[in-house]
């Protein structure tokens, strides 16, 4: 699948969704256009931390809250790092063909709006759906709705496992749904690529702006649900190119990457457990990372407390003393304000165990408050 073809497909998907005839906006049970949205107002402050000098251009003590979008909190209250608003529209072109677009504005970007989703969707039959265009890269269990803070208990999904340099992709995917002996089955396979200029995550690790490309993307996932249990397994492979905008240095160039992931979630009456495990393997560069999280909580009327433990560790035999290694704990309290809004308070303790040759963010404690809503 060539970049030119992907650009053409993406433009077509966006145009199909935006070129809606006036009659589609009329109210009624059979509206062709469906609109929805979400918003999060998040404030955070690092209460204490080990590092006192700046981390690149960021004041410390500091805490990385969103790797994928380069959001980092410092020693004063900040509201732009994770605050965001998004609007999504789906237009039914025919009973089987639809177009979807989603625009998101993030405070960390200066509230610049970006087209996060833009795809055409065709229902082949009751089991199969084919989609073409721009979507969220399905690395993690919460990837598809990670931006919708109202959809989960935390202020943010655990950062030790959630967050990588590429968030979206342009391509094609096919989704299969069925029931296997009492198990609800959902499976997805996809192909595509993504080009990220001035990559947001890499500005946390480099002084110079970096361009990152994930090409020859191929992957799939399988979600099984039965009763109290939901499980998910995923596999993704691709080639990685990274180049400095300043001097053209490649790091890496065409390196092969494999991603493996497992998740298992349980809901037993008021109690619930959330767990996830992921591996990123770039063996050609002797790089491999492992991360996991496990959390548990309970629902007590409008209140939902939750405790979560996380861990992340890299391996690199070329630079064994410059690996990132950390673990963390978070305590979250969610309060339901109504049918579509929730208030959350979260305390995070990040323990930096990185190698002596890596100058990282250091151990820190973060307090954050979020107001999440959907509409």
Regions found by a protein language model. Name each.
Residues 26-67:
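Transmembrane beta-strand segments of Gram-negative outer membrane beta-barrel proteins
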Residues 67-72, 102-103, 153-158, 202-206, ...:
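Extracytoplasmic loops and strand-loop junctions of Gram-negative outer membrane beta-barrel proteins
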Residues 19-22:
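N-terminal signal peptide c-region/cleavage motif recognized by signal peptidases
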Residues 1-10:
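Bacterial N-terminal signal peptides that target proteins for export
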Residues 32-34, 42-44, 73-196, 223-227, ...:
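Outer membrane beta-barrel
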Residues 75, 79-85, 112-116, 166-170, ...:
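Residues that define the transmembrane beta-barrel architecture of outer-membrane proteins
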Residues 27-29, 121-123, 143-145, 151, ...:
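Outer-membrane beta-barrel pore domains
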Residues 194-242:
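Loop-centered beta-sheet repeat module
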